[in-house]
């Protein structure tokens, strides 16, 4: 995991959550999908992906779309449905499940109109449950179908125990092993 505030990292290791050694062929998992491209447009509850996207209707459902640059930069959401004919993905806020976008930069207003300057990244959606704390947010970097890094966007607060981390990607064939660490109530 990587913390953007101090640059500390935790990359994949050869150790499973239970401390046992990993099969080197499973490091990073298998079958994870990702896509980076320029949007055609979008609104408060949708994004129209690039006309070069070749995904079927189920490939991206449940995954996260992040606006990485241009109009809407910093916004992110869970993809709830995708029409490969129109390239329209419907999105929901990860914070409460309602239609729309969240923003990594809470002080920035959500842009309700996306345009041809909007670039996006579709990636596995990572979320945390339990542990007594809240607010931890992590992005997963995918290369060649494997998760190669986790980036801590927000380390959260109030964690008294290690939370459970879930990686959502309907394309995954072998789950990526990972280990979560907390220190001083936050992801470390």
What are these regions (language model features)?
Residues 73:
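Exposed loop/turn and edge beta-strand positions of beta-sandwich/beta-sheet ligand-binding modules
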């Amino acid at each position: 995991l990587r913390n953007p505030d101090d640059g500390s990292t935790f990359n994949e290791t050869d150790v499973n959550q239970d401390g046992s050694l990993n099969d080197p062929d499973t490091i990073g998992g298998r079958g994870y999908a990702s896509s980076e491209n320029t949007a055609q447009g979008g609104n408060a509850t949708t994004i129209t992906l690039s006309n070069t996207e070749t995904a079927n209707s189920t490939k991206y459902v449940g995954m996260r779309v992040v606006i990485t640059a241009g109009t809407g930069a910093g916004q992110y959401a869970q993809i709830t449905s995708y029409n490969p004919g129109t390239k329209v993905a419907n999105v929901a806020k990860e914070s409460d499940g309602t239609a729309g976008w969240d923003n990594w930069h809470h002080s920035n207003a959500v842009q309700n109109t996306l345009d041809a300057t909007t670039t996006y990244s579709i990636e596995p959606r990572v979320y945390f449950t339990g542990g007594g704390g809240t607010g931890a947010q992590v992005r997963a970097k995918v290369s060649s179908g494997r998760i190669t890094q986790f980036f801590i966007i927000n380390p959260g607060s109030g964690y008294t125990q290690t939370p459970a981390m879930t990686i959502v990607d309907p394309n995954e064939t072998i789950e990526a092993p990972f280990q979560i660490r907390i220190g001083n109530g936050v992801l470390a």
